[in-house]
Each structure stands twice: as structure tokens, then as C-alpha cells.
């Protein structure tokens, strides 16, 4: 009791350091750590930067990660906390081993043609194709008569975060899927022959597979959409809790607004939209625009945390 007769307040539990077992009787007990409701929820993580990545210059060959791991504070390559985007550029007539430590990786062929070979399946690919590869250690890419440029997004950071490994082929939740440019154009023609409602966010082609059709995803956690914008239009501002990685496929005088910042498109640029950021896409040009978007949306749909909302009418 103080001189004035009042009782001293106990220290705030938020100021307690991390606690250990007082007298552990085993190695398992010694590994226990304890926090409290005053200090357990004040972990400060770096924000996900909104950033644009350019494709590799002509004549530069190899795998080019769109890596923000330093800004994100993680010790593995990552574009967003759970996704990694990359470019792969190959010289004509060369081959590249491509191990994939992911549940699945989405690919888009920007230029050139070649052959993809896995352990049990393979196919020829050409510019404009989309394909999905389940995680595996033994893929090989072969470029044919011209240089090849590909864009890919997978969930490698998600597996690295939990030190996980791709499932064995018989247990994998996804299969190899190949969507040719011709089939994609057929699907676009069908979409543009139909009407839309006020609640539809533009005209976009959503990719899925036989195994993931019920969820409308391409992998359990990744969604892929091929969005379009007519000339002199914009996609209404909106937000969602998934992060988004966008490839600018087609369009002149196009830009995105992300958290109030104008992000001009350049050919084949990769744009990062942070989770929760208000954003919109704009086409001020005279021709239609197209852009591919990969999100970790499957994860949020499953967790009921997508939080999608339009921010304008």
C-alpha cells in the first residue's frame, strides 16, 4: 500500500515477456511457450507491396522470379505471402528442367512454341495457351524453332510456409490440364454472345478443371480468370481479401488504380494487388484489353473470408 493508502496497480500483462515451462520434465515440455491476450496479437507483419514487374529483356534466358520476399520478410521466394509469379525465357532449340514444389502452377505462353514433358504426360504448347501443372520434380520444357517466353504463378510460398511438399501423383488434388489458345477464343466468343447483369464484374473467362469444377477453381487455393475490358470503359472499383497477380496481355492506354495509385500497364507486365486493397482496371484505348488474374481466392472461398465488395455503382 502506498503512502496515500491506495493499492498499487499490478503490471500490465501485455508487458510480460514470452513464458517458458517453469520445471520441464521432458524435452517436449521444454518446447512449450506461452503468451497472453495482451501480447499475443500484436505481431506486426510487413504490408504486401503493390508493384509491377517487367518481363525479361530479349536475349536474357532462364527463370526470373517476381520476388518480394525481402519486403515480405520471408526466407523463400514469394510475390505475395502465398503465391510466386515468374517468367521463364528459353532460347530456340534449348531445354530446361523445371521442378515445381507447389500444389499446382498456372502457366501462360506469351511467345513461342514448344513441348512440355512430365513423368507420365506431355503435350506441345503454343502462344496463347494456358496450362496447369501439378507439383512434381521432373518436368522438362523444350523450346522449338523460336525463343519461348512463359509466365507462371504457383503456391510455392504456401507450401514453403508450412515446409510442405507436393502430394504424390496418386494423391494430388489436381491433374495436368491444357487449354489451347483456339479453345480459349471459342470460349470468349461464347461469353461475348451472351448478356450480363448489373452484378457481373465485366466479361471474364474463369478456368477450372474436372477435379476442381465444383469449386470453380483451377487448384484448391488458386483461381484463374482471363478478364476483358471494352474500349473507354473500366471495371468497377472493388476489393477482396485475396491477393491478386495480374498479367497485362493486351491493351494500350490501360492502367489499374490500386489504393488510389495509378499503375500504368506495359506489355506483359506483372502487377501485384495487395489483399484488401481497393482497385479498379481502366481501358482508355481504342481496342479491347485483356488481362490474366491469379488469386489465392480458392483459399478464401473455402475459409468464407473472401470479403468481395464493389466500391462504386
Please give the residue ranges for each predicted region:
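C-terminal functional regions that serve as terminal interaction/effector modules
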Residues: 2-46, 236, 243-313
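A short, N-terminal "cap"/entry segment at the start of jelly-roll beta-barrel domains
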Residues: 2-80, 160-225, 307-309, 313
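Extended, compositionally biased flexible segments
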Residues: 52-86, 95-119, 127
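Conserved short histidine dyad/triad with adjacent acidic residue
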Residues: 64-74, 84-101, 208-213, 223-240
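Short, low-complexity cationic-aromatic patches
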Residues: 76-78, 94-106, 138-145, 215, ...
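Conserved metal-binding segment of the jelly-roll/cupin
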Residues: 91, 124-146, 151-156, 264-285, ...
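A short beta-strand-loop-beta hairpin characteristic of the jelly-roll/cupin
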Residues: 91, 95-129, 243-267, 305
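A short beta-to-alpha transition loop/helix N-cap that caps and shapes the active-site region
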Residues: 142, 158-163, 299-304
Amino acid at each position: 500500500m502506498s503512502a496515500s493508502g491506495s493499492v498499487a496497480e499490478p503490471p500490465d500483462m501485455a508487458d510480460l515477456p514470452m513464458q517458458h515451462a517453469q520445471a520441464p520434465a521432458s524435452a517436449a515440455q521444454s518446447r512449450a511457450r506461452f503468451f497472453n491476450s495482451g501480447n499475443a496479437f500484436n505481431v506486426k507483419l510487413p504490408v504486401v507491396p503493390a508493384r509491377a514487374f517487367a518481363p525479361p529483356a530479349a536475349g536474357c534466358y532462364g527463370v526470373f522470379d517476381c520476388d518480394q520476399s525481402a519486403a515480405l520478410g520471408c526466407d523463400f521466394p514469394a510475390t505475395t505471402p502465398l503465391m510466386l509469379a515468374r517468367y521463364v525465357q528459353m532460347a530456340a532449340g534449348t531445354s530446361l528442367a523445371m521442378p515445381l514444389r507447389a500444389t499446382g502452377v498456372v502457366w501462360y505462353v506469351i511467345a513461342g512454341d514448344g513441348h512440355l514433358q512430365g513423368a507420365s504426360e506431355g503435350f506441345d504448347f503454343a502462344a496463347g495457351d494456358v496450362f496447369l501443372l501439378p507439383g512434381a520434380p521432373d518436368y522438362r520444357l523444350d523450346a522449338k524453332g523460336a525463343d519461348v517466353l512463359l509466365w507462371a504463378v504457383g503456391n510455392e510460398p504456401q507450401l514453403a510456409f508450412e515446409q510442405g511438399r507436393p502430394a504424390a501423383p496418386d494423391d494430388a488434388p489436381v491433374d495436368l490440364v491444357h487449354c489451347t489458345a483456339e479453345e480459349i477464343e471459342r470460349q470468349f466468343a461464347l461469353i461475348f454472345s451472351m448478356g450480363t447483369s448489373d452484378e457481373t464484374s465485366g466479361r471474364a473467362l474463369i478456368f477450372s478443371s474436372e477435379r476442381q469444377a465444383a469449386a470453380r477453381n483451377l487448384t484448391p487455393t488458386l483461381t484463374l480468370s482471363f478478364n476483358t475490358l471494352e474500349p473507354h470503359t473500366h471495371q468497377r472499383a472493388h476489393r477482396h481479401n485475396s491477393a491478386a497477380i495480374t498479367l497485362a496481355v493486351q491493351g494500350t492506354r490501360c492502367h489499374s488504380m490500386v489504393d488510389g495509385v495509378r499503375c500504368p500497364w506495359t506489355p506483359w507486365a506483372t502487377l501485384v494487388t495487395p489483399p484488401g486493397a481497393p482497385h479498379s482496371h481502366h481501358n482508355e484505348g481504342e481496342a479491347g484489353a485483356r488481362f490474366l488474374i491469379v488469386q489465392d481466392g480458392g483459399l478464401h472461398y473455402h475459409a468464407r473470408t473472401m470479403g468481395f465488395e464493389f466500391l462504386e455503382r
